[in-house]
């Protein structure tokens, strides 16, 4: 998952299908859920109730119906289980706001019989523990259930909230722990399973999943999917809407609403080249196809690396490819994250730091070293600003146990930028001729597995450090992994491409003379970001008006510029921007782009009132994850806790 040019943390199933007919259950009283019990403590993974040391899901089959009227998914989930502990008698799953109708187990005879289950009292962060009694250690268990209309991992959009405004839209966001809100699962990245699915819907929408989507499949309301590679639960994904497909290359293409699909295909036309670059560096792409789905602007993140079907925000479609590093990032996850996965969310840097580093390498290869350097410098500058307000423990790559913290809220730029900076440090110390083969071997040796920071450190000490024994000290490794902040010996990115923007800004601030249009016409998004970002805390209204007249920042369709320009106007009292600010935060639900604007607004009473009014209008179109973030910010502001 990636927020391009990140400034705030972004933080996004099934065997050959379960049979619609089953053998009659033996004569016995129907099992009913026991009374709700208190939420028990969690072990193994602080964010999951699952007990994978006792029993693990190996394959999952979904048979679901999409109901746009009720805004629910309903049906069955069938689990193929591997029992590891011969004494275990329970299957424990994670759920959130699910209605469980019944649970059945298949006996050795093939007959299905009801199983007793208990659904614990819900925890506000982790949901409800579902305990299923299985005294015979059933190899197949089936749950009949339905989701809530307010499931945190699903968003339902009315036609008016889509590009085409004709058909409704639904999509999921399972990372970090939202898969449990639409499928009962061992919702931990330490468990991987293959899956298949049968999904029915209204016949005028196309349904897609993080699986083998067929571009030629008829739009008939009846769809089947299969994912033969094992994935963790957070990569389970589904979407349904008015979607068309356009091929980009032999194994890549774009799904989008009809009005968007051509623009998206043009913007992402280098995707096949990106795959080639990544394969040359880190080995074969192991997921078959790499397709992308462009979602409505309410999608709360920049992208989500769902295997075979990356979910992407339309806010990166600028017409000049200046933000396609998002696709490089999500593609890079095909090695770092999807192939080798953090074992728990406290090790998230193994996903996001590695991916940001691989993204930089792809960007450098296709768009030049200068582009990669500009993006690194922006990321590093913003990380250094962010850590000033962070607790020291949160600034380490190797995080302490999250305990009761929501992993969505514990994610910061540290995992992305400090993680990538650390790998860049290793690359510089050992040289690419040594570091590139090492990183490839890490991916190869841990393919389709989950890993911890301790495992990576042990692997590095065995396979990298001996190649140049004096290149890195234990103290330096400890500074990167376990100490707060950025080590003083870290080399900072320095982009030559920012020299003109810095010079132009300094000259304008001193003389009021804007740079020549022939110069600024050549600037890419990253240079405009640097130009605005160096303006300081405030400008005069007259200065902002001059910039606006020349560059039309107010009302810009470029989210990376908007998220920096609008906070500057708010701090400076430039009220002329307010109408466009309202339009922007009511149209876009991507947290990275709108949270800095809300955070600036709530610092004053009139700004807080404006934010509340805008949010009230925007909320029906926001994703539940975005809604929760804004509501928490507004609540803190009203309590006197301004950002």
What feature does the model see in each segment?
Residues 2-19:
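Gram-negative bacterial Sec-dependent N-terminal signal peptides
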Residues 18-288, 430:
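Acidic/His-enriched low-complexity segments
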Residues 21-31, 100, 225, 254-505:
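Hydrophobic alpha-helical and helix-loop surface patches within well-folded domains
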Residues 48-56, 61-65, 69-71, 78-80, ...:
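Mature, folded catalytic cores of secreted/periplasmic enzymes
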Residues 85-87, 106-113, 136-138, 215-222, ...:
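Short, glycine- and charge-enriched coil/turn segments that flank and shape catalytic ligand pockets
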Residues 98, 230, 316-317, 570:
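Hydrophobic pocket-lining residues within nucleotide cofactor-binding pockets
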Residues 153, 434-435, 574-579:
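Short, solvent-exposed secondary-structure capping/transition elements
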Residues 412-414, 418-419, 446-452, 464-643:
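Long, ordered, helix-rich scaffold segments
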């Amino acid at each position: 998952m990636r927020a391009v040019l990140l400034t705030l943390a972004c933080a996004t199933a099934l065997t050959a299908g379960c049979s619609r007919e089953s053998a009659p259950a033996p004569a016995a009283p129907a099992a009913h859920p026991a009374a709700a019990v208190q939420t028990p403590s969690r072990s193994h993974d602080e964010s999951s109730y699952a007990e994978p040391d006792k029993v693990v899901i190996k394959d999952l089959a979904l048979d679901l119906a999409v109901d746009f009227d009720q805004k629910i998914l309903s049906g069955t989930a069938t689990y193929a289980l591997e029992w590891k502990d011969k004494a275990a008698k329970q299957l424990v799953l994670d759920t959130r706001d699910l209605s469980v109708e019944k649970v059945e187990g298949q006996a050795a005879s093939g007959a299905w019989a009801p199983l007793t289950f208990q659904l614990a009292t819900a925890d506000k962060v982790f949901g409800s523990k579902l305990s299923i009694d299985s005294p015979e250690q059933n190899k197949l268990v089936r749950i009949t259930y339905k989701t809530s209309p307010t499931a945190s991992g699903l968003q339902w959009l009315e036609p008016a909230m889509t590009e085409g405004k004709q058909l409704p839209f639904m999509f999921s966001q399972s990372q970090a722990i939202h898969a449990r809100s639409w499928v009962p699962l061992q919702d931990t990245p330490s468990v991987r399973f293959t899956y298949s699915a049968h999904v029915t819907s209204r016949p005028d929408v196309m349904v897609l999943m993080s699986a083998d989507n067929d571009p030629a499949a008829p739009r008939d309301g009846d769809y089947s999917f299969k994912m033969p590679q094992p994935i963790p639960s957070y990569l389970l994904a589904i979407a349904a809407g008015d979607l068309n497909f356009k091929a980009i290359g032999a194994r890549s293409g774009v799904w989008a609403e009809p009005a968007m699909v051509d623009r998206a295909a043009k913007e992402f036309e280098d995707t096949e080249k990106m795959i080639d670059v990544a394969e040359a560096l880190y080995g074969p792409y192991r997921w078959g196809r790499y397709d992308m789905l462009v979602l409505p602007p309410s999608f709360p993140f920049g992208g989500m690396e769902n295997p075979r079907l990356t979910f992407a925000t339309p806010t990166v479609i600028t017409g000049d490819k200046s933000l396609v590093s998002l696709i490089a990032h999500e593609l890079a996850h095909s090695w770092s994250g999807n192939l080798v996965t953090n074992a728990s969310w406290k090790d998230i840097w193994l996903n996001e730091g590695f991916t940001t580093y691989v993204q930089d390498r792809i960007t450098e290869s296709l768009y030049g070293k200068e582009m990669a350097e500009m993006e690194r410098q922006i990321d590093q500058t913003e990380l250094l600003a962010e850590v000033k307000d962070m607790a020291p423990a949160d600034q380490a790559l190797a995080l302490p146990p999250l305990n009761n913290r929501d992993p969505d809220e514990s994610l910061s730029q540290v995992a992305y930028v400090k993680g990538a900076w650390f790998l860049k440090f290793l690359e510089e110390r050992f040289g690419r001729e040594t570091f590139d083969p090492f990183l490839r071997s890490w991916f190869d040796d841990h393919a389709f597995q989950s890993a911890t920071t301790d495992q990576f450190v042990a692997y590095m000490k065995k396979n990298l450090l001996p190649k140049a024994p004096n290149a890195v000290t234990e103290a330096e490794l400890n500074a990167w992994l376990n100490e707060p902040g950025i080590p003083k010996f870290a080399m900072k990115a320095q982009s030559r491409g920012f020299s003109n923007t810095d010079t132009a800004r300094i000259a304008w601030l001193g003389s009021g003379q804007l740079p020549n249009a022939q110069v600024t016409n050549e600037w890419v998004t990253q240079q405009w970001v640097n130009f605005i970002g160096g303006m300081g805390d405030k400008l005069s209204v007259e200065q902002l008006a001059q910039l606006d007249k020349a560059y039309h920042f107010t009302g810009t369709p470029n989210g990376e510029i908007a998220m920096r320009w609008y906070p500057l106007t708010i701090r400076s009292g430039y009220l002329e921007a307010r109408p466009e600010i309202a339009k922007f935060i009511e149209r876009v639900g991507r947290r990275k782009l709108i949270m800095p604007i809300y955070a600036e607004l709530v610092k004053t009473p009139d700004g807080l009132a404006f934010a509340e009014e805008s949010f009230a209008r925007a909320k029906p179109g926001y994703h539940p994850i975005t809604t929760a973030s804004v509501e928490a910010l507004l609540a803190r502001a009203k309590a006197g806790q301004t950002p």
